[in-house]
A protein has these predicted regions:
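Helix-loop-beta element that forms the nucleotide-linked donor phosphate-binding surface
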Residues: 34-48
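Metal-dependent catalytic neighborhoods of phosphoester/phosphodiester hydrolases
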Residues: 10-20, 39, 163-173, 198-199
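Active-site metal-binding motif and surrounding structural segment of the metallo-beta-lactamase
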Residues: 1-26, 115-121
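Alpha-helix capping/helix-boundary segments
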Residues: 6, 30-31, 51
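Core dinuclear metal-dependent hydrolase active-site scaffold
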Residues: 12, 47-115, 191-237
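Cap/insert and terminal regions of metallo-dependent hydrolase folds
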Residues: 23-32, 94, 102-191
Length: 237
């Protein structure tokens, strides 16, 4: 769990996972939320940046790394807990997960200390030009991917929660158009679909049919163009 915002730390999801007895690895301070949600303290490991934890069995290790974001679930706990990116490593493979973040030069340091990566998972949705310090968006995600040294690119944090004013599929369409120019291998399965990155086929824009709602003979397209102001309100997550 990268940080404590509601779209990353969901009560119902945590409660369901807690019943399975799986271990939780998270950022400093977030463990208190997990305990309050019913996770036994013995199953929670909190990490500061650059700390790592090897899960039971010894085959999977998680390292917390820097990200550029913030935390808080209410009006009085702003930045009371840490936010992180995560590197998940086995003997054969290494995966980078950005959590929520703006574009940061720390990615170069992460590459030096923890890379290279077979798969890079970067947040691309819920973005706005005035939020660049805390959210990547598709263009900055491509820059972050380069700083991290490449690897297959699995875009995350898009198409689910409506947290910004752009069309829900804009991140996907932007990446589909611009990633080939940079020689980036995109991995874009349907939401929730298992995928093996090495065997991933050419991206098909499945979201184009998912974005239309049919009401009788009328097609109502959700991804309408919106008039986005130059400055948008500060996001809550």
């Amino acid at each position: 769990v990268s940080h404590d915002h509601y779209d990353h730390l969901d009560y119902g999801t945590v409660r369901a996972l807690a019943k399975t007895g799986v271990p939780f690895v998270t950022s400093l301070g977030v463990g208190a939320h997990l305990e309050a949600f019913g996770v036994p303290a013995g199953l929670i490991t909190e990490l500061d940046w650059w700390e790592h934890h090897t899960l039971p069995g010894g085959e999977l290790a998680v390292t917390a790394a820097p990200s550029q974001h913030f935390s808080g679930r209410g009006l009085k706990d702003r930045n009371a807990t840490l936010w992180s990116s995560m590197v998940i490593r086995t003997a054969k493979h290494s995966v980078f997960f950005s959590g929520d973040t703006g574009l940061t030069t720390e990615y170069g340091l992460i590459r030096e200390r923890l890379g290279p990566f077979d798969l890079v998972m970067l947040e691309v949705g819920a973005f706005h030009p005035s939020w660049g310090d805390i959210h990547l968006g598709p263009d900055n995600a491509l820059e972050a991917h380069a700083l991290l040294g490449g690897g297959a690119f699995l875009p995350v944090h898009w198409g689910t929660f409506s947290l910004a004013m752009h069309a829900w599929d804009e991140p996907a369409e932007t990446l589909l158009a611009r990633a080939p120019e940079r020689g980036v291998q995109l991995v874009m399965p349907r939401l929730g679909e298992p995928v093996e990155p090495v065997q991933a086929e050419r991206v098909t824009p499945w979201w184009r049919s998912a974005g239309s709602l049919h009401a009788g003979d009328t097609v109502v397209t959700e991804a309408e163009a919106l008039s986005v102001p130059k400055v948008a309100g500060w996001p809550l997550d």
